[in-house]
C-alpha cells in the first residue's frame, strides 16, 4: 500500500506512547511520508470529525499509540476519511489494538509492502429528534480526569431531514451509543423501540446499543453477550434495570433501535464511544442504526479473537474440568480443513505472539 500521509494519534500522557511516536516519525522521515500528530491527552481543541481529518493532514493511514480509548479516537478520524487505521497496543485489557509497541517499525514496513489484510468493522450512526447539545454546566464534569471534550455532532448535510425520521447526525460509533441518567438519585425512564415497535419501557441507570466490536466493552461489563466482531448485529443492553426483564436483545443490522426519554423521566446524557456528546430532555429520542460506512482496520495476521478473549478477560477453567498443561487446539493447526469445512473460518497457522 502506498502511504503518502500518516496521521499519528498519540496518548501523550504515556511515556511508552511518546517513545513509539518517535519511532513512527523516524520511519516516516526515512520513507518521505508526511506525518501529522494529534495528541489526545494535551490537545484541547474541540473539533468535529471533518476538522479533525484536516488537522491530521488528510491521512491515508492512521496509526494510534495508546489503549482502546486512543484507538477509538483514531477510528473516528479514519472512518470520517475512509482511511486505514493501525492500532499499536499500549493498553492493558483492550481488544482493538493490533501490534505490540516493539513491532511498530516492522508493522509499518508490512503496510508499505502490502503484507496486510483489511478487517472491515461495523459502525453505528444516529438520528435524533433535535440537535444534540451539551449544557455548559456539564462540560467541567464531563472533562474531569479526561482529555478534551468532543463537540456535539453536526447535522449531516447530505441526508434528508424529516419530521418522522429526525435529524441525521454526522457521527459514527465503533463501540457503543449510551443513554444514561444524569441525576444520582433517580434512574432514567426510556421507551425502547426495535424497528419502530415498542419493545418495553425501562427504568435503568443506562441503556446502551453496541456493535459486535463493542460487545466486549461497556455492554460486556453490564452483562451483555460476547459477539464475534465479524458478525453483523446491534446489541441492546440495559444497565441495572428496575424490572424483571433485564436481558440483552440482539437485532439484525437492518432492525434499528430507538430510545425515547419518557415524560416521567429526568434528562439523560448521550455518550458515543465513551464521550459525552449531548443531553436529551423528556420527549426527546435518538435512533441508532448500522452506518453505511465501515471502519477499515489493518490486520497483519489471522485474528485470534477467542484466544484474546481468554487472555484479556483472564478466563479460567472449571476446577473439575481443567486438564494438565496447555490446552491443545481442537483442530489441527498444520493442515487445511477438509472440503466440507472449507467455508468455515478456522485458524490454520500458529498465532504470532
Can you annotate each of these PLM segments?
Residues 1-81, 114:
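N-terminal glycine-/serine-/threonine-rich phosphate-binding loop
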Residues 68-70, 93, 213-215:
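Short glycine-rich anion-binding loops that position phosphate/pyrophosphate groups of nucleotides
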Residues 82-98:
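Short, acidic/small-residue loops that bind anionic groups at enzyme active sites
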Residues 95-205:
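Catalytic core of DAGKc-family lipid kinases
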Residues 192, 214, 270:
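Short aromatic-centered micro-motifs
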Amino acid at each position: 500500500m502506498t502511504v503518502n500521509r500518516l496521521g499519528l494519534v498519540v496518548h501523550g500522557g504515556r511515556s511508552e506512547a511518546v517513545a513509539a511516536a518517535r519511532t513512527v516519525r523516524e520511519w516516516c522521515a526515512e520513507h518521505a511520508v508526511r506525518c501529522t500528530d494529534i495528541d489526545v491527552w494535551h490537545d484541547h481543541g474541540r473539533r468535529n470529525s471533518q476538522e479533525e481529518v484536516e488537522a491530521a493532514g488528510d491521512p491515508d493511514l492512521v496509526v494510534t499509540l495508546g489503549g482502546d480509548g486512543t484507538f477509538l479516537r483514531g477510528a473516528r478520524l479514519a472512518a470520517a476519511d475512509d482511511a486505514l487505521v493501525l492500532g499499536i497496543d499500549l493498553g492493558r485489557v483492550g481488544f482493538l489494538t493490533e501490534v505490540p509497541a516493539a513491532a511498530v517499525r516492522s508493522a509499518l514496513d508490512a503496510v508499505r509492502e502490502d503484507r496486510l489484510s483489511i478487517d472491515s468493522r461495523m459502525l453505528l450512526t444516529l438520528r435524533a429528534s433535535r440537535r444534540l447539545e451539551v449544557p455548559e454546566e456539564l462540560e467541567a464534569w464531563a472533562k474531569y480526569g479526561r482529555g478534551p471534550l468532543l463537540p456535539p455532532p453536526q447535522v449531516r448535510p447530505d441526508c434528508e431531514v424529516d419530521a418522522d425520521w429526525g435529524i441525521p447526525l454526522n457521527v459514527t460509533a465503533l463501540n457503543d451509543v449510551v443513554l444514561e441518567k444524569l441525576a444520582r438519585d433517580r434512574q432514567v425512564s426510556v421507551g425502547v423501540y426495535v424497528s419502530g415497535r415498542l419493545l418495553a419501557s425501562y427504568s435503568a441507570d443506562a441503556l446502551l446499543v453496541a456493535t459486535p466490536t463493542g460487545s466486549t466493552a461497556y455492554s460486556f461489563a453490564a452483562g451483555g453477550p460476547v459477539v464475534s466482531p465479524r458478525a453483523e448485529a446491534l446489541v441492546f443492553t440495559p444497565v441495572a434495570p428496575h424490572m424483571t426483564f433485564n436481558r440483552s436483545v440482539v437485532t439484525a443490522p437492518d432492525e434499528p433501535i430507538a430510545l425515547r426519554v419518557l415524560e416521567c423521566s429526568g434528562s439523560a446524557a448521550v455518550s458515543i464511544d465513551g464521550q459525552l456528546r449531548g443531553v436529551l430532555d423528556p420527549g426527546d429520542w435518538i435512533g441508532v442504526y448500522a452506518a453505511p460506512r465501515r471502519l477499515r482496520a489493518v490486520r497483519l495476521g489471522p485474528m485470534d479473537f477467542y484466544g484474546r478473549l481468554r487472555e484479556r478477560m483472564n478466563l479460567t477453567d472449571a476446577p473439575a474440568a481443567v486438564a494438565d498443561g496447555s490446552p491443545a487446539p481442537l483442530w489441527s493447526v498444520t493442515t487445511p480443513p477438509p472440503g466440507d469445512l472449507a467455508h468455515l473460518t478456522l485458524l490454520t497457522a500458529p498465532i504470532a505472539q
